[in-house]
C-alpha cells in the first residue's frame, strides 16, 4: 500500500481492521496511519499502539540484499516533512528504522521500521521463520532469536489453477481420486515414484513444445505491432 495507498483508501472511504505490509517497501503505510491518528487527537504513543496492534508484516527474502536501506541524506530529502508531521525529531524518526537506535552510522531500514510498527511478523515457511528470527535478532536487544515474535506461515498454491492440465491428468491417473481433496497427504505423493520416467519426461517435452510455440507467437505479435526489423525477428525465431 504505502503512503499513497492509505491516502487512496481514505479517499474511497475504505477502513480496515488489519493492514498488511507485504515486504518492507510497503511499511511506509504505517507512517501515514500514525499521522492520521495524530490528527484525530491521539498522542504519539497511543497512535503507535493502535498501528502496531493492527499491523502485520510478512518478509519473503532471507538475504540482506533483499531488505532496502536508505542513506540518511537521501531519506531526509524525501521524509523530513513526515517526521515533522509525527512530531518527532529527525533522529527519533531515523531510529525507528535502525537496529541499534542512536547509531548514527546506521542507515534507515524499511524492514526494521516494519518490525517496529507491526505487532505480527512472519516468514513464509518454518525454515524461513527461523532464518528471519536470526536475521532480525538485533532489533530486540536482550532476547534470544527464538524469543522474538517472528513467526511463519507456509506459502501454498491453489492446485487447480497452478498445475497445468497435462500434469493434473497425470496426477489423477496415478494418484487416484482422493488426491484432489487431500493434497497435503505425503503418502499420496509417494506414488510419484511409481510413475514411469518416460511418462514424466514426455509430459515435460510436450509442455516445453507448447511453451516455445507460445513464445514464438507472442514475439511475432510484438514484432508486427512495433514494426521491428524483419531479419532480426526471423533470426530470433529460428534460434528458439
Go through each PLM region and give its residues.
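Catalytic cores of carbohydrate-active enzymes across secretory and cytosolic contexts
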Residues: 1-240
Amino acid at each position: 500500500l504505502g503512503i499513497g495507498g492509505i491516502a487512496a483508501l481514505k479517499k474511497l472511504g475504505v477502513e480496515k481492521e488489519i493492514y498488511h505490509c507485504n515486504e518492507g517497501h510497503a511499511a511506509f503505510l504505517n507512517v501515514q496511519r500514525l499521522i492520521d491518528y495524530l490528527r484525530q487527537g491521539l498522542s504519539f504513543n497511543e497512535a503507535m499502539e493502535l498501528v502496531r496492534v493492527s499491523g502485520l508484516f510478512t518478509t519473503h527474502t532471507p538475504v540482506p540484499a533483499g531488505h532496502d536501506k536508505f542513506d540518511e541524506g537521501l531519506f531526509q530529502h524525501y521524509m523530513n516533512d513526515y517526521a515533522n508531521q509525527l512530531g518527532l525529531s529527525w533522529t527519533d524518526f531515523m531510529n525507528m528504522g535502525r537496529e541499534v537506535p542512536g547509531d548514527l552510522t546506521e542507515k534507515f531500514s524499511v524492514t526494521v521500521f516494519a518490525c517496529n510498527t507491526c505487532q505480527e511478523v512472519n516468514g513464509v515457511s518454518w525454515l524461513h521463520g527461523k532464518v528471519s528470527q536470526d536475521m532480525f535478532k538485533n532489533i530486540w536487544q536482550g532476547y534470544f532469536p527464538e524469543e522474538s515474535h517472528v513467526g511463519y506461515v507456509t506459502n501454498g498454491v491453489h492446485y487447480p489453477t497452478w498445475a497445468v492440465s497435462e500434469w493434473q491428468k497425470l496426477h489423477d491417473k496415478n494418484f487416484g481420486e482422493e488426491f484432489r481433496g487431500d493434497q497435503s497427504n505425503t503418502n499420496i505423493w509417494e506414488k510419484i515414484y511409481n510413475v514411469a520416467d518416460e511418462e514424466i519426461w514426455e509430459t515435460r517435452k510436450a509442455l516445453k513444445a507448447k511453451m516455445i510455440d507460445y513464445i514464438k507467437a507472442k514475439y511475432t505479435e510484438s514484432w508486427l505491432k512495433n514494426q521491428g526489423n524483419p531479419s532480426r525477428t526471423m533470426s530470433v525465431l529460428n534460434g528458439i
